[in-house]
Amino acid sequence: MNIIFNACRYLCIALCLLLSSFLHSQMIDYQNLSLQQALEIGLKNNKNIQISHLKQEMSATKEKDLKMEKLPDIEFHTSYTQVTNLYQHQNGVFNKATKYDAINGMYDFTLSASIPVYMGGKIKNTEQKAAIDTEISALRTHLDERQLTMEIITAFLQIHHLKEQQSLINDKMKEDSVNIKQVKALKANGVVTVNEVLRTSLQLSNHKMSWTELDNDIQIAEHKLKTILSLPEDQEMHVNTEDLISDNAAIPYVDELTETALHKNESVEISHKNLSLKELDQKITKANYLPKITAGGEYFLKYPNMMFFPPEPYAYRLGMVGVNLTYPIESLYKNKYKMQEARENIDLAKLQIEENEEKIRHNVYEAYKKFEETDQKVKIAEESINQAKENYRIVRTKYANKLSLITELIDADNTYLEAESNLISVKINRQLKYYQLQYTIGNL
C-alpha cells in the first residue's frame, strides 16, 4: 500500500513540475519579447553559458576529490597458492635430488592501511590550487554571462535601429503618396510636366525598396538573436525595443571608471589568481627537496607459519604498525631547473598582470572617449536636423509657388531624411557606447 502511495506522490510531483514549466513558457510572450526576458532566456539556454557552468561544477568536483587525498588508503588482499614438494640437488643437477615434503597449501588474508603524514606541503598546496581553479572558473563563467548580456543588448539595439529607420521610411512613403497626388493634380491643371510626376513616383519607389531591405534586415537580426538565445527554429519571435534609449546616462570621470574597472573586471582578478597558482607551483616544486613521511600498518592471517624455520603447518595472525620516511636524493640535482622554471613562471605572471592592467586602462579610456564622441555627435545631429527641416520647408514653399524645381524639392527631402536617419543612428550608437563602457568597467 505504501509503495502505491509513494508512486502516486512522485507522479503528482512530476506533473506539478511539468505544469509549472509549461506555465512559465506560456508566460513569455515571444511575439513581444522584452530585453529583460531575452536576457533571462539567454542565460538559461545559451550553450556557451551551459558549458561554462559545467566547467565550474567540474572544477568544484576536482577540488573535492583532491581533499580526499588526505584520507588513509585502505586495502584488503587475499590469495591462495598450491605449492609442490621441494627437490634439492645436493650432488649436482644430473644426480638424483633429495626430496623434502613441503606444506602444499598457502593462503593469506591481509588488511593494510597507510596515511600521508608529511609530504613537504604538496597535498595542502595542491588543494589550494584546486580552490583557486574553482574561483577562476567562477570568474570565467561570470565573464561569459556578461559577454552574452552585451551580445543580446547589442542585438536589441541593432533591431531597434532597423525598426526606427523603417518607421522613418514608412512616414516618408506616406508623404510621397501625398506629394504624388498633389503633383498629379498640378499636372491635370497643366502647371507641371509629366517629368515631375515621374520623379515623385521614382522617389516613392526608392523608399519602398529601402523599406523592403530594412524589413529583411530586421528578420535576419531577429533570427540571429533567436540563435543566440538557443530557441527552437520553429519558434516565432519578435522583440519589443521600446524604452531602450535613455538620454540621462550620467558618466563619472575617467579616473573613477578606471579604478572601478581594475577592481571589478574579471580579467584583472583572473590574472592575480594566476599569479597565486604559479607561486603554489613553486612551493610544490620546492617540496621535492623535502622528505616524505607516511604512517601505516597491516593485520593479516596467514597459513602456514613462515615466521619459524622450518615452517609450521599452522595459521597465524600478526599486526604491524610503523612510520616510513623517504628522501629523494636525486632531487638535489634533478630539481634545479624545475625551480628555475617555476620562478620564471612567477615573473611572467607578474608581467601579465601589469600588461593586463595597462590594457584595461586603455580600454576604459577608449570606451570613455567614444561615448563622449557620440554625445557630441547627438548635439551636432540635432542641429543638422533643424537646419535640414527648415531648408525642406523653404524649398517646399518655393515649389508650391513654382519658384523651385522638383529636383530641388527631392534633394531637400533626401537631405532631411538623411539628417533624421543620422540622428536615429547617433542616438542608438550613443546608447550602445554607454553599454560598452559599462561592460568594460565590469558594471554590466
What is the meaning of each model-derived region?
Residues 50-54, 67-68, 103, 117-145, ...:
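Sec/SRP-type N-terminal targeting helices
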Residues 25-75, 79, 233, 239-276, ...:
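Bacterial Sec-pathway N-terminal export signals of envelope proteins
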Residues 110-112, 156, 258, 322-324, ...:
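Membrane-embedded beta-strand positions in outer-membrane beta-barrel channels/transporters
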